[in-house]
Amino acid sequence: MTDQAEKKHSAFWGVMVIAGTVIGGGMFALPVDLAGAWFFWGAFILIIAWFSMLHSGLLLLEANLNYPVGSSFNTITKDLIGNTWNIISGITVAFVLYILTYAYISANGAIISETISMNLGYHANPRIVGICTAIFVASVLWISSLAASRITSLFLGLKIISFVIVFGSFFFLVDYSILRDATSSTAGTSYFPYIFMALPVCLASFGFHGNIPSLIICYGKRKDKLIKSVVFGSLLALVIYLFWLYCTMGNIPRESFKAIISSGGNVDSLVKSFLGTKQHGIIEFCLLVFSNLAVASSFFGVTLGLFDYLADLFKIDNSHGGRFKTVLLTFLPPALLYLIFPNGFIYGIGGAGLCATIWAVIIPAVLAIKARKKFPNQMFTVWGGNLIPAIVILFGITVILCWFGNVFNVLPKFG
């Protein structure tokens, strides 16, 4: 990429790619998983997760900038920490991105078919809808990564508009007695123990790391634009998440979340609880628009990261023929899995959590430490010396322990 090509892309697109990837269908799980900790402790642990994931992303960017444009996890890990860690990293990256691609194909099929049914009265087969959605996204990626980035930006913009319309009205209807849990039968109990069960979900809510190599392809080594993209994209996501928690936990009583959790904690349960409080036609419509766009923008972001990762892994060129091969590698495995197991959104998101902790938290910190030794005059170094990588690694270990604590029912669960 020439300097002229790099300069013409505004940092705005990078911010939208990061935020569009992060702010997706998974955000509907946040108020459900944070119901035990409730608003104030939930906001606290969400900010901790954002701080840690932001810096793990910057550490990954730091290591990546020492290598040629287009280099991905495979190239960097093999050079800095050896083939064994490269294999571990490769397995976790591929698993997370593939399983998320599968999950979003599943979610798109379910949400779009439900929207068609509610508005047109026509029952569309979710499998057909999901596959058609995958074909559309694959076609865009085949054209160019920049086209995918711009569509993600468009979806994010529309998503924010629908979000503001829906929750702007609920913002002014927040009941502070509900937000403080003052009227609940559990009022006055300890909320702190429930933050640990929510940590893995909070981590997954800031999973933008697969898009960093794609940003470098777009911007080259313009570190100012890259840093702005990561910082402001993740910060935008944090602000929207906090606003989202404020509106949900200020309108839906904490006790009501027990019923949502018992019904599986799916998107439709939370939306129905919202509509049950103050239902309006325009609000219902915008909720449907928002839920569709939330999943669609994350779908584009995740597949863009997987596409670039596979192109680097198999050294496939950027020609139309090469991009077509990469598209097939990106979409065929998750599409086939979706045809066999069409309803795996929640299982897919949950299964990706542990691996995401390894490759999106621990490995970036290790890569940055190794890169500082190998490239003492590198162009970008995250502030704080070795303290920041240490904090990030500690956060990752804590999340892993909490994940296993959830699996083996060691941690307290709400509902």
Curated annotation (Swiss-Prot):
The keyword Cell inner membrane applies. It comes from the Bacteria. Residues 33, 108-127, 175-191, 251-286, 348, 409-415 are periplasmic. GO terms for biological process: amino acid transmembrane transport; L-tryptophan catabolic process. Pfam families: Trp_Tyr_perm (PF03222). One of its GO terms (cellular component) is plasma membrane. It is found in: Cell inner membrane. It is a multi-pass membrane protein. GO terms for molecular function: aromatic amino acid transmembrane transporter activity. The keyword DNA repair does not apply. Residues 1-11, 55-86, 149-153, 213-229, 308-326, 370-387 are cytoplasmic. The chain crosses the membrane at residues 12-32, 34-54, 87-107, 128-148, 154-174, 192-212, 230-250, 287-307, 327-347, 349-369, 388-408. Keywords: Amino-acid transport, Cell inner membrane, Cell membrane, Membrane, Transmembrane, Transmembrane helix, Transport, Tryptophan catabolism. Involved in tryptophan transport across the cytoplasmic membrane. Plays a role in transporting tryptophan which is to be used catabolically. PANTHER family: LOW AFFINITY TRYPTOPHAN PERMEASE-RELATED. Belongs to the amino acid/polyamine transporter 2 family. Mtr/TnaB/TyrP permease subfamily. This is Low affinity tryptophan permease. It comes from Escherichia coli O157:H7. The lineage of its organism: Bacteria, Pseudomonadati, Pseudomonadota, Gammaproteobacteria, Enterobacterales.
